[in-house]
C-alpha cells in the first residue's frame, strides 16, 4: 500500500510506513522496489538506531552475513536449494531461526516470478537450476525467537514474529552470469561483504 516497506523491531516484513517516531534501540528494515526501463529491482537493508542492545546488533550482523553466505553459495549450474542450505546452516549455528513463510524470488519484467528462493532447505528447490541469465533475490529474514510469523489482523499486511522477538532482513537482486553471481543492487556507499555493524 506504500512505495516502501519499513519494518521495525519485531516486524519481519511488509511494515507500512507511519508517523511512529523512531527511538534509540530500534532496528529498522527499509525495503525498496524500483522499476528501470521496465525491469524490476528489489533491495532491503536493516538500520540500527543507536544505541542498540548487543543482541540486536548481533542479529543484524548475522543476518547481513547470511545474505552473503547465500550469494556465495549461488553458482551457475547450482540449484536454489544450495542457497537455502547455506543460509539455514549459517543462521542455525549462530542461534537464529530462518523465516519460512516468506522467501526470495525470481525478478525481471515481473516483480515476482520463478524461481522461488527459500532461505532454508526445500527438497523441491533442488530442481531449480541457476542458469546464466537467471535474475532473483536473496533476502534472508532471521529471528531471535521462533521462525513463525503472523499477519497483523488490522491492516492485513504487516508481518510480525509470532513471539514478539526481533527480526532483521537484508536483500539484494542477483543476476547469474557465466562467471557467477552479480549483485545488481550494490551501491558505492552501502555496506559491502565483510562490513561490521
Model-derived segments and their meaning:
Residues 1-197:
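Active-site neighborhoods and metal-handling regions in enzymes and metal-associated proteins
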